[in-house]
């Protein structure tokens, strides 16, 4: 099964995880980048990122190469913002024809909200369930054995080995 990891990363936790999963699965990587970058300041990232996520904004993305027909499985990766998916992911989903694909997702969070974010992702995709889900707490900035075990278990999911 040919897979691609489509992700957005602000501070590197999601990118770190995407690369770990890609190495284990042999998946391709597609990093989404908005034309106008989000701020990374301690307060401003929460204010602007949270507002953007809660308002379901769809920012313009920098050009990327993607052919949906080349993949059976799409794995979405994102940081959790205000219990929501990140706006660049929403833009991608609404811009691409993803019908007939298997979907999985991983979310990186500092506190809580990934469960609600996964529900919003399923709604955005128009599906009832994801083939695999993974929630990590700051995997790059606070590495630990539990996160590594969760990544391995996620990659061992039958949906990736059909």
At which residue positions do the language-model features occur?
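N-terminal beta1-alpha1-beta2 submodule of the flavodoxin-like/Rossmannoid cofactor-binding fold
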Residues: 1-76, 83-85, 90, 94, ...
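Structural beta-sheet core signal
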Residues: 5, 76, 104-107, 132
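A generic structural motif
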Residues: 31-34, 106-107, 132-138
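Short Gly/Pro-enriched loop/turn and capping motifs at secondary-structure junctions
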Residues: 80-83, 109-113, 138-141
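Short, conserved loop/helix-junction motifs that constitute active-site signature segments
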Residues: 94-100, 124-127
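Short, aromatic/basic amphipathic alpha-helical patches
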Residues: 116-125
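Glycine-rich phosphate/pyrophosphate-binding loop and the adjoining helix
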Residues: 129-162
